[in-house]
Amino acid sequence: MSPTPKTRSNFVESIVGLMPRLEFRRIKRAEDFAEVFRLRYRAYIANELIEPNQRGMSIDNYDLLENCQIFGLFLDGNLSSSLRIHRVTADTPWCPAIKSFGEYLKPELEEGNSFVDGSRFCVEPSRDPELSALPFLTVRFAYMASVHFAATYNLSVVRSEHAAFYRRYYGFERWAGGVRLDWYKIPVDLYVGDMRENRSRIDERLPFMQSNFEERLMLFTDELPDQGIKSVKGLFGNTATNSVRENSPGSNLREWLDSAVG
């Protein structure tokens, strides 16, 4: 049963009402990877954030790392947004944020803290303008991952005009900024959310961010797919899915990477 606060805003109610139409999918199949990389490209080109490339995809080396997981949010069966996460610990200290802001983040790893770095956020540029909930629901992947992996911090590297979203709704704080990435046209800032301080407030204010154990197990591990279970229901009627990994999706990714960096 979904959590039911005494009162909910119309905004929260609208998102909760949307949830049964949503599939939160762990991306593993070559055709799904290709669809996500094309969505990234469309979104970034539409916002003039990257240079065009012949392949029409946006992919980088971080997509190939062992601590990387890529997700797609499907509305009525159509890919509507995507997010990539890296689970970052002292044993797996690799993620885009570490490269750009290592002087701030590496000391935290040395102290035994951990991160979930959410990156390559993108939303279908041709979506219905009324679907203002998509950014919240896309960030939900990183939030669920932070809960599942008991991460100390949730990271997001964003351009300045998006910072208010993370500050207002998720309690993120700016740790550093004004950095230029080699593939991105606009300077970015590092925003960090302390899960120890923010989780209870987020759960209360944005109840649709919550998830059950089965949903997180489906998305962030292979335990259920290995048992032949490919989908489960979330707290609010949404579906979480995780397909069986193909034998060699990496060969496709490396081929695309050679012609579509950005």
What are these regions (language model features)?
Residues F11-D60, Q69-F74, L79:
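Short amphipathic alpha-helix that is part of the acyltransferase structural core
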Residues M1-M19, L235-G262:
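Short acidic N-proximal helix/loop "leader" segments that mark the beginning
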Residues M19, L65-E66, K185:
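A generic fold-level signal
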Residues N53-E110, V116-R120:
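Conserved donor-binding loop and adjoining core beta-sheet/short helix segment
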Residues D91-R199:
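Acyl-donor binding region in acyl/amide transferases
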